[in-house]
């Protein structure tokens, strides 16, 4: 199998610490340039984990359409500015950042007080302008995730604490382009040269982004290396196909889905280990959510969970 190599031929960092990198990957067999380029592009834009501010609590404010005395921006504008802040978290757990500024002042992300596990990438990001005597005091929730996360009005953990939610953009890669050229290797022209242009928000270098995307693709395809011909499986080892269905197929509400995920319930097979009583013991999982899961299993798959806990043999 022919080997290829890659090279970073151009890189730069802008004033806001966003970064750009240009990579050449060659030689690839004819047609593989498009295959590799498209797969990497999709993963770079959708699957890399990033960090974002997901909610904000501002002293004296209880809704996003309010104004703050002595602050030029209204609350909605402040939230939009907070949405643009670029962070990098080294912790898997949500973190809380704080800000308290007295006017007169121009407030930027440089004023943030964040945990040691969190790095502010662009400290010049503008937040608000304060007049003399005014005070802007807030707390904000920092989370890791992938893709785009819309406001979830059902989240009790933030709603009950007066946090105003923000549509979070976790994507660390802002843009990806790729082109295919002929690779002139020796006398053969039947090979591809893949050229990739990657722009990031600064929380990843383009090199790290490309490396992580390749790792995700490798882990995705790794199980396919061990595919066994179904004809070779002994008849006594058949598996109920419905048990392998992911819980996403049940089309549950966001609240019920998130509770199941936090409890490490990822498939119907995992759910079958629970009785109806067991569901109610899941953290933040109420009667309404339990009924929703029970109904979805019955209507979509014809599966009925036992009412009571099943005694396990010792």
UniProtKB/Swiss-Prot annotation:
GO terms for molecular function: DNA binding; DNA-directed RNA polymerase activity; protein dimerization activity. Residues 240-314 are annotated as: Alpha C-terminal domain (alpha-CTD). Its EC number is 2.7.7.6. GO terms for biological process: DNA-templated transcription. The keyword Amino-acid biosynthesis does not apply. InterPro entries: DNA-dir_RNA_pol_insert, DNA-dir_RNA_pol_RpoA/D/Rpb3, DNA-dir_RpoA, RBP11-like, RNAP_asu_C, RNApol_insert_sf. The keyword Chaperone does not apply. Keywords: DNA-directed RNA polymerase, Nucleotidyltransferase, Transcription, Transferase. One of its GO terms (cellular component) is cytoplasm. Residues 1-228 are annotated as: Alpha N-terminal domain (alpha-NTD). Pfam families: RNA_pol_A_bac, RNA_pol_A_CTD, RNA_pol_L. It catalyses: RNA(n) + a ribonucleoside 5'-triphosphate = RNA(n+1) + diphosphate. SMART domains: RPOLD. DNA-dependent RNA polymerase catalyzes the transcription of DNA into RNA using the four ribonucleoside triphosphates as substrates. The N-terminal domain is essential for RNAP assembly and basal transcription, whereas the C-terminal domain is involved in interaction with transcriptional regulators and with upstream promoter elements. In cyanobacteria the RNAP catalytic core is composed of 2 alpha, 1 beta, 1 beta', 1 gamma and 1 omega subunit. When a sigma factor is associated with the core the holoenzyme is formed, which can initiate transcription. Belongs to the RNA polymerase alpha chain family. This is DNA-directed RNA polymerase subunit alpha.
